[in-house]
Design a protein with these regions (language model features):
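Short, exposed coil/turn segments at beta-strand boundaries within extracellular/luminal domains
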Residues: 47, 72-78, 168-175, 258-263
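Proline-enriched interdomain boundary motifs that mark the N-terminal boundary
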Residues: 1-4, 88-95, 185-192, 273-277
């Protein structure tokens, strides 16, 4: 007899050691122990020919143990029994940065879990706001929560440290610690349409919040670089077109805050000059 099937964690504080319980009876017995696979297991006490050696398991896996017994006249193979070794799960989740609110965290797309030869029995996520940033919260969506294997989370602007813990039968859970940094979306105050006369002086363009930049809605209009230009930190619009033709020119104001870009569009109507014959 060689005992029964056993399980254990290779990463627990106490090493996973199995004593092979040999109850064979007879005179002048010789023993040969065989373990398959051989990688990840070693003899803690004794060797392959010891009566009741001890095995130390250092890697997760399913190991088959067999005992061959002989006394010179007879050879017998006892039935194989299995030892299941597992380890602390490995969890991989990359840091999240350069995102604009709301940021949709889809767990199945971002979480990698190596169960290390044992089923995950418990999951727990912890989300903690980092100091120095006014994090505005998050919402669990799609029926998930902080105990879901793959939680789905909508983050508002934030700076969080997230700990994702996945536990099997090992005493210590596997963890991934990662950062979530989501920038705040700051909208552009709606731009009113405006008018200007053909060939008038260039007009300074203004918008709120300040610090953004202007572009033409249609960058292919003739002489675009002269119509919209920047000088001394200000953007100017110059209506230098056919003096006798009415035009509508679309202008777009962009404002960036980190990864967030807000935009608004206005129409500049250009009135033609009077035509005198």
């Amino acid at each position: 007899s060689v005992g029964k099937d056993s399980v254990g964690c290779t990463d627990d504080p106490d090493p996973f050691v199995i004593t092979l319980n040999n109850l064979s009876e007879g005179d002048s017995l010789a023993y040969t122990w065989t373990v398959t696979p051989q990688q990840g297991v070693s003899f803690a006490e004794g060797d392959t020919n010891s009566e009741s050696p001890k095995l130390l398991f250092s890697e997760p896996g399913d190991y088959d143990v067999r005992l061959a017994v002989s006394n010179g006249c007879h050879h017998d193979d006892d039935s194989v029994f299995r030892i299941k070794a597992f380890a602390i799960p490995r969890v991989r989740i990359g840091d999240i940065a350069d995102q604009c609110e709301p940021f949709h965290f889809i767990g199945r797309e971002r979480v990698e879990v190596d169960q290390r030869n044992d089923k995950i029995q418990q999951v727990h996520w912890t989300i903690t706001a980092n100091q120095g940033y006014a994090s505005e919260g998050y919402t669990l969506v799609n029926g998930t929560d902080l105990k879901s294997y793959y939680p789905d989370i909508d983050f508002k602007t934030c700076d969080y440290t997230v700990v994702a813990a996945y536990k099997n039968r090992c005493k210590t859970p596997g963890q991934a610690v990662f950062q979530v940094k989501v920038d705040k979306f700051i909208p552009v105050i709606p731009l009113p349409d405006d008018t200007i006369c053909e060939l008038a002086e260039a007009r300074i363009l203004r918008a709120q919040p300040e610090g953004g930049w202007w572009t033409l809605k249609d960058p292919a209009i003739p002489e675009a670089a002269e119509v919209l230009y920047t000088e001394w930190g200000n953007s100017y619009f110059y209506p230098g077109f056919d003096p006798y033709a009415q035009k509508d020119i679309g202008l777009v104001y962009h404002y960036r805050n980190g990864a967030c870009i807000a935009r608004d569009t206005m129409n500049m109507r250009i009135w033609p000059l009077p035509y005198v014959e």
